[in-house]
């Protein structure tokens, strides 16, 4: 099966329309062939096995309407949750993140640091290694996630 960004976008939109109020689709991705993995979060409760099973039963018909008949996996975004929208960066101001950008910024593509400020077009990251600040536009981010220090 060939997966295009447009198809994944259509499936993501179908999932978002079907999700109950207070539930957010954090990320959708294809993994291991026809397995559609949905990372969801919700207000006011855990993303446990029972909740994930309920979400599968809710979104499966919407995905079938879009022509998707493969397997569906629903999971919590986890401790190192992806940041896929500007609202995620705003929510986690002051937290440590790892960011990859498509085009180099200041000669590099990978950054680890603390989100200092968020604006409409991007955010400012205080780098872990030297405390310098770098401004990164949202449009250049190819991957970002919380970076928890599990040794603490």
From Swiss-Prot:
Gene3D superfamilies: Ribosome maturation factor RimP, C-terminal domain (2.30.30.180), RimP-like superfamily, N-terminal (3.30.300.70). Its main location: cytoplasm. GO terms for biological process: ribosomal small subunit assembly; translation. HAMAP family: RimP. This is Ribosome maturation factor RimP. Required for maturation of 30S ribosomal subunits. Keywords: Cytoplasm, Ribosome biogenesis. It comes from Rubrobacter xylanophilus (strain DSM 9941 / JCM 11954 / NBRC 16129 / PRD-1). It is found in: Cytoplasm. PANTHER family: RIBOSOME MATURATION FACTOR RIMP (PTHR33867:SF1).
